[in-house]
């Protein structure tokens, strides 16, 4: 687990997300509290629970990204789900325990990648031996192998085609019990049993020497790793460091005077209660306790209110942060200050065609103005509106770029208004096009 301070986490988030200071601080503190808990001993460590977060704000203002980025920074398993995808136990659909099973799968991938890095040097040497076997045969003399090894390391053999044998991981069929989503994971794991019964199956692949290395290094790494250790570590990481982001939680809040579907929505909330507080979920790798998993929930709450959630669920989300709608200045900063801003992306994309793009300050002002106006008059979709506007403005250049190698295009306010101004003013048209 990383030991970044809250200030460092917020500083990292500032590179990618504009504004939303309160939400950034809440997530940064929650992440730091994870590290603090790890420093405690015995009983106190067990007693310290994460303070789950409820983010309230319109779409496109950074809720998901504020949750995802710190998880990536900490190397923690992160899963994003939408509350509306789940149904009450007993109904057709996914049950909420699938969230934890997905989290464990992600944790296993993370741990395996980390362990592969530890054995990469040894795996690389083993992969080199297998490439030599494919090139000169296993019975070749040491002198011949050394001669080819030098050529290999100098890159002289990169384009030569060889045949390699690799593990056939996709050989076993995956069984699922009809009407019981996830049952193949928790109850029966016929796929694993069949895989073991059939032994380590391999398949032959034809590839170039250069392309064979990543495949063989992965194959050799897996041979050097203890899979049981990976699973145990992944279960621990899921329990102690896992982050679950549940979006659209407002859609399962029972609205006053509602009926029918409200029963099922309330059922999903009741199923979430034990998950968010403390339960043990059975996965095919073993049981996972959820009491130290951090849950971050979010919703726009346009129609319903946070108080429409079940009181018990509200109590399990003690930290509330409100995210503000984006202003004109926010849009300007999103276009110019973020690490991989849309403007930087389009400039880089056009450079691949040897076309140069330049944006004037008044063009950025015009783009921000149009995005704000459209969000106000059509539908507020936050920063995502900029993608639609930029795509419309640069449509002609993107289409003709292959024929304009060496050209320079200067995007100014006049160009932006020429391409989009009329559409933005015509509300009926902009509803369909922007």
Curated annotation (Swiss-Prot):
Listed CDD domains: RecA-like_HslU (cd19498)
Where do the TM regions start and end? none
Recite the UniProt keywords alphabetically: ATP-binding, Chaperone, Cytoplasm, Nucleotide-binding, Stress response
Q: Which InterPro entries match?
A: AAA+_ATPase (IPR003593), ATP-dep_Clp_protease_ClpX (IPR050052), ATPase_AAA_core (IPR003959), Clp_ATPase_C (IPR019489), HslU (IPR004491), P-loop_NTPase (IPR027417)
For molecular function, the Gene Ontology terms on record are:
ATP binding; ATP hydrolysis activity; peptidase activity; proteasome-activating activity
Cystine connections? none
Q: Give me any GO biological process, just one.
A: proteolysis involved in protein catabolic process
NCBIfam families the UniProt entry points to: hslU, PRK05201.1
Quaternary assembly = A double ring-shaped homohexamer of HslV is capped on each side by a ring-shaped HslU homohexamer. The assembly of the HslU/HslV complex is dependent on binding of ATP.
The name on file for this protein is ATP-dependent protease ATPase subunit HslU
Q: Which organism is it from?
A: Brucella ovis (strain ATCC 25840 / 63/290 / NCTC 10512)
